[in-house]
């Protein structure tokens, strides 16, 4: 005798579970866009990232001219680790720099530095 089993009762709850998990998971591009927006906010914030004090950034008001213009960043720094290191503590690479060590001095958190890098890589 051959036993026959119906898979329909199992498939419906399994499908519902899979759909609910997929619906609850945040979308990758939405998270990335959120980080870029937060990075832009920090870069333009005169009290936090304050990139505009020294750098020209597209869309920023009253930019400084001490540092280089922040454009074509992804082509200049294809490895984001390099840019993270610069923001964290540029004095390790260039002891004569006037760039503040944002990470070492705890001006910015690691998460904030990464958000700014996400933003800069869109320029």
Model feature map: region roles:
Residues 1-33:
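N-terminal export/targeting leaders of redox proteins
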Residues 37, 68, 97-101:
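Positions in alpha-helical segments
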Residues 1-12, 82-101:
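Extended, non-globular alpha-helical segments
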Residues 26-46:
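Electrostatic cytochrome c docking/interface patches
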Residues 81, 86, 92, 104-123:
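C-terminal capping alpha-helices of c-type cytochrome domains
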Residues 44, 52-88, 104:
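Gly/Gly-Pro-rich "capping" loops immediately C-terminal to redox-active cysteine motifs
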Residues 35, 62-66, 95:
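N-terminal alpha-helical segment
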Residues 49:
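Cys/His-enriched microdomains
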């Amino acid at each position: 005798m051959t036993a026959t089993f119906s898979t329909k009762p199992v498939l419906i709850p399994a499908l519902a579970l899979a759909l609910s998990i997929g619906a609850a998971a945040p979308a990758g591009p939405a998270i990335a866009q959120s980080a870029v927006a937060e990075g832009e906010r920090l870069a333009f914030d005169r009290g936090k990232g304050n990139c505009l004090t020294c750098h020209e950034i597209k869309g920023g008001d009253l930019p400084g001219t001490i540092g280089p213009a922040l454009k074509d960043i992804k082509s200049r720094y294809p490895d984001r680790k390099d840019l993270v290191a610069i923001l964290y503590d540029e004095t390790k690479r260039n002891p004569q720099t006037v760039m503040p060590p944002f990470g070492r001095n705890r001006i910015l958190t690691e998460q904030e530095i990464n958000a700014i890098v996400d933003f800069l890589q869109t320029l």
